[in-house]
């Protein structure tokens, strides 16, 4: 049954950390996908399963935020902004572990797709802030979607949102290395040279500056 499947997914929170890390990017979205299921028992199982992942979080800063993160995942319209603010205001001194990232990433995705430029800006800021706090292996499964979302924010009409998105992209490239972004610089240069994309060129110019700053000035050679 769907309920049994969700409970099984929740039990995977107690896997060996290495096994869990490899599976989180698949497990958590499946649980989130049935949080609003038409069947009450399935919703309850999904809620309980998600809480299990909150229980295995090792980052003490995120542990304190688990209640608001879970509320934002369950009712994004109502709580996303509050969760983003809580993440921005938190001073992290420990690495963000896989289970922490699995919860945070859903808040970021929701913020990136919000109609408010300010909400997108907050989501981008969190991406930039967390880049140095996350193990590369934990971030890789989410990377392509994050890049796509940040690049959309880079062409937002609001300058502050564009600038924050550009900084987030620069932080990701600096943390993960150019090899993870093989076509990024050529793509940004193509946009800069395309006179038909005047609205996108500002964002691309800012992003290119941040990326080159992250990689080092030798990239200008």
Residue ranges and their predicted role:
Residues 20-35, 59-74, 98-112, 138-154, ...:
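HEAT/HEAT-like alpha-solenoid repeats
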Residues 38-39, 73-77, 115-116, 157-158, ...:
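Short inter-helical turns and helix N-cap capping residues of alpha-solenoid HEAT/ARM repeat scaffolds
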Residues 87, 197-199:
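Acidic, Ser/Thr- and Gly/Pro-rich intrinsically disordered linkers and low-complexity segments
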Residues 2, 43, 80-81, 120, ...:
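Residue-level detector of extended alpha-helical repeat arrays and alpha-solenoid scaffolds
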Residues 5-16, 34-35, 49-57, 73, ...:
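Hydrophobic residues within the alpha-helices of tandem HEAT/HEAT-like
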């Amino acid at each position: 049954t769907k309920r049994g499947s969700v409970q099984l997914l929740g039990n995977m929170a107690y896997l060996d950390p290495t096994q869990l890390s490899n599976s989180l990017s698949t497990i958590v979205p499946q649980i989130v996908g049935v949080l609003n299921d038409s069947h009450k028992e399935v919703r309850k199982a999904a809620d309980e399963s998600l809480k299990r992942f909150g229980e295995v979080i090792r980052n003490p800063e995120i542990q304190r935020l688990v209640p608001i993160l879970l509320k934002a995942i369950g009712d994004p319209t109502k709580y996303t902004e509050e969760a983003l603010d809580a993440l921005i205001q938190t001073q992290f001194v420990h690495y963000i572990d896989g289970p922490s990232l699995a919860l945070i990433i859903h808040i970021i995705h929701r913020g990136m797709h919000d109609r408010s430029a300010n909400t997108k800006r907050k989501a981008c800021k969190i991406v930039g802030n967390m880049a140095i706090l996350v193990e590369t292996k934990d971030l890789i499964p989410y990377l392509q979607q994050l890049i796509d979302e940040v690049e959309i924010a880079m062409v937002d009409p609001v300058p502050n949102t564009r600038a924050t998105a550009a900084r987030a992209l620069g932080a990701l490239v600096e943390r993960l290395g150019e090899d993870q972004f093989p076509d990024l610089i050529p793509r940004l240069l193509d946009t800069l040279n395309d006179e038909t994309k005047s609205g996108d060129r500002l964002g691309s110019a800012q992003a290119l500056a941040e990326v080159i700053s992250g990689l080092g000035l030798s990239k200008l050679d």
